[in-house]
Amino acid sequence: MATQIPSKPSTSETVPTESLKERINRQMIVILDFGSQYSELIARRIRETNVYSEVLSYRTSAEQLRQLAPKGIILSGGPNSVYDKNAPQCTQEIWDLGIPILGVCYGMQLMVQQLGGKVERAKRAEYGKASLHIDDPTDLLTNVEDNSIAWMSHGDSCIELPDGFKILAHTDNTPCAAIANHEQKLFGVQFHPEVVHSVGGIALIRNFVYHICECEPTWTTEAFVEEAIREIRAKIGDKRVLLALSGGVDSSTLAFLLHRAIGDQLTCMFIDQGFMRKGEPERLMEIFDHQFHIPVVYVNSREQFLEQLKGVTDPEEKRRLIGHEFIKVFEEESNRLGPFDYLAQGTLYPDVIESADSNVDPQTGERVAVKIKSHHNVGGLPKNLRFKLVEPLRKLFKDEVRKVARSIGLPEEIVRRHPFPGPGLAIRIIGEVTSERLKILRDADFVVRDEISKQGMYHDFWQAFAVLLPVRSVGVMGDQRTYAHPVVLRLITSEDGMTADWAKVPYDLLEIISNRIVNEVRGVNRVVYDITSKPPGTIEWE
């Protein structure tokens, strides 16, 4: 029996007079970002406690903070020293807002410096794990065990505290590992409670959120879905919406959410550019069109995408051409199917943060963005498209999208699908993309996914895939000399894709995968395993 998704309500349904959004925002924690690699992680950790959080620039004014009226503020870490000439500084007025504040690493040092204390270069820098000795186990450090592990990453130290502050904890090398001014509800920690290595970190964050800021747990999956549907209906009214479906968890969740909110006013378009994994286009159509009765317009553009990549070997040029062709096909099909009033996009919160505020340059204090490679997801739709945007997922992190997906009934194969780049297999073929090389890689990649699934290990990896190299190697098969392609196996573990470790896969599984690829995939005679972590490498090869 097909699973039914509730469509738009009858006009007799009542709309709540008070928005959930207002209730959620009244419990918000704001993170002021000073360029830390962990700022987003702090926000995620707070949201895991069912309290909403946002990451804002350290330049946010006191007046803006007053208008937001958060229950608490966290000052993030950062790469600078507070005594540097161009070190980023928050407004001094922040200390007079009467809002509880927690400074983390650089944030704590900034608190100390701005309130009259002293920060200097530490005699001994502290990086990695340290034992946290607790001097005052109340308030911030309630339920944090004495001598538990804390993750340190600092070269400076607070050597003199402002008036009204006391030491809550220390390490062997850091006299002021945690501090507090209880009267003003100002707290600081020299370590990073948000990272998994800090054993008592989650307890500390919960203490700040619930005991010090007195937040209520209003940020839940159910609350988000309810509010998102209400906002979609209010914004769209009786207009039509177009969504470019990719088959990933983001666009699939967006499709389900929109269909639940506005029903047949939504048109989903799937552009098959020919670079998806084996069986994926067919399975996508089966799930949406047949299983859940969400109509999808299928556009077969395989030949024209392949034609665009003829003779192209540069990875950035591949991305550019694929993106350009995607826009061309999208415009043609939207004109044919239209008119539409809205374009739905699966923008996530990290995209919002990245576009609003990039990293802090440690030399100048200015925020800059360094491009490692063009973003994998094929987007970049032209600015002159005649659509208004609707982005219901723009407040969510990836892990939150998966929770929403599960709550609204998406199949687990989509919910827990490994991340897949927008250009697909085209950037896992090093060098020119041809139909022959696509078949080789598609077949090899299928073996990888098939075997880890058989072993019940699919969900043990963040990603698991094959890469086809543009070289050949000599081999021997059936007493005959072969000269064929090597395939690289890339299996990695990660929490969020920002950093990643190569997976310590059992040798017998690697052997099975290797034997199957060499025997089943024509054109391959060698299999190698990539043991590079991120950093220094990236997850994808291109």
Swiss-Prot record:
Pfam families: GATase, GMP_synt_C. One of its GO terms (cellular component) is cytosol. It is an enzyme of class 6 (ligase). SUPFAM superfamilies: Adenine nucleotide alpha hydrolases-like, Class I glutamine amidotransferase-like, GMP synthetase C-terminal dimerisation domain. The keyword ATP-binding applies. Residues 219-417 form the GMPS ATP-PPase domain. It comes from the Bacteria. InterPro entries: Class_I_gatase-like, GATASE, GMP_synth_C, GMP_synth_GATase, GMP_synthase, GMPS_ATP_PPase_dom, Rossmann-like_a/b/a_fold. Its EC number is 6.3.5.2. ATP binds at S246, G247, G248, V249, D250, S251, S252. Keywords: ATP-binding, Glutamine amidotransferase, GMP biosynthesis, Ligase, Nucleotide-binding, Purine biosynthesis. Catalyzes the synthesis of GMP from XMP. Homodimer. This is GMP synthase [glutamine-hydrolyzing]. It comes from Gloeothece citriformis (strain PCC 7424) (Cyanothece sp. (strain PCC 7424)). The lineage of its organism: Bacteria, Bacillati, Cyanobacteriota, Cyanophyceae, Oscillatoriophycideae.
